[in-house]
Each structure stands twice: as C-alpha cells, then as structure tokens.
Amino acid sequence: YTTLFRSSYLDLKQLVTADMPHPTVISEKKFGASWFMPAGDSYIANMYADAGADYVFKELPGAGSTPLAFETVLDRAIHADMWLIKYNQSEDMTYGDLRAEYAPYENFDAFKNRRIYSCNTGLVPYYEEFPLHPDYLLKDLIWVFHPELLPGYSPRYYRKMQD
C-alpha cells in the first residue's frame, strides 16, 4: 500500500509547477494566549509547499509548532492570501463564529477577502485517514491553492468557510 500512496502523492505533487503563482498562506488560529504556528519543517509546511503555496512562517525552526503572540502573527501575516484552519466542533464554523471567537481575526486580508478554508475534524476523518493517506490531504490542498488543476474535485477535508 505504501508504494501506491507514495506514487499517488508524487503524481499529485507534479501537477504543481514552480512557475505558477504560489499564494501566501497561514495556518490554524490562536489557542488561549498563543497562536501555535506550524514550524518550517513540519509536515503541514512541507505539504503547503508541495501543493504550491508560500507558507508565511516557513522560516520557523523545527518540525513541531511554535507558540506566537497574536500581534506577531498579525504583523507578518496580515496580507496572507489564504488561511487554513482545523477545528473540532459539531457544526461548521462561519466567518461570524470566527469573529465572535476573536474579533481581531477580521483584520487579516484572508478574512476580509473570504479566503479562509476550514477542516472540521469533528465531521470529517482527517486524523483517522491522514497518517495512511497523505495523498488525500495533498489533493485537498492543491484544490484550495490551485482549483484549476483539479476541475470537478470534491474535497475530503477542507471547505471554503461560509458567512
């Protein structure tokens, strides 16, 4: 199976070329006083690159996540093109829910331009499938960043956040 998944992953990765636009992206949201941003060598930072995105915090050292102050994230990522969030709730989060959770989120361009994509891990099997099928996640990320490469694709995990 591993060879099959690796082959699928590499086939998907080849859809993305260096000369196409690479939208800037940020990840997750603050938890308590900190925003735990994936580090530059984390699986998700690498997958963003493989999917053709420019991860704003790719220089963060390490492979885990780094706690950052909200102001630090806002300063560096206010103009990020896109924002991807994972959460676990009984219903999908909306822009209104995100604003109610923390009003300063609305300062980000990705919020203003309605370019937030969310993965509700309470409703989709992200954590159950991803370890065995990284190709599924990569396909979703390519769809988010470059939908023209996957016409007619119906994403498994990520959805465009609704108002």
Regions found by a protein language model. Name each.
Residues 1-4:
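Short, small-residue-biased leader/transition segments that mark boundaries at the very start
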Residues 6-25:
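Append "and occasionally in soluble cytosolic enzymes with long acidic Gly/Pro-rich linkers
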Residues 19-25, 51-54, 78-82, 112-115:
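Loop/turn elements at helix/coil->beta-strand transitions in domains of secreted/extracellular proteins
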Residues 22-42:
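Extracytoplasmic ligand-binding site segments that recognize negatively charged/polar headgroups
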Residues 33-35, 56-61, 124-131:
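Active-site rim elements
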Residues 44-65, 84-87, 118:
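His/Asp/Glu-enriched short active-site or ligand-binding loop at hydrolase and phosphoryl-transfer sites
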Residues 68-79:
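Short helices/loops that flank or line small-molecule/ion binding pockets
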Residues 85-163:
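Structured C-terminal subdomain patch of bacterial secreted/periplasmic proteins
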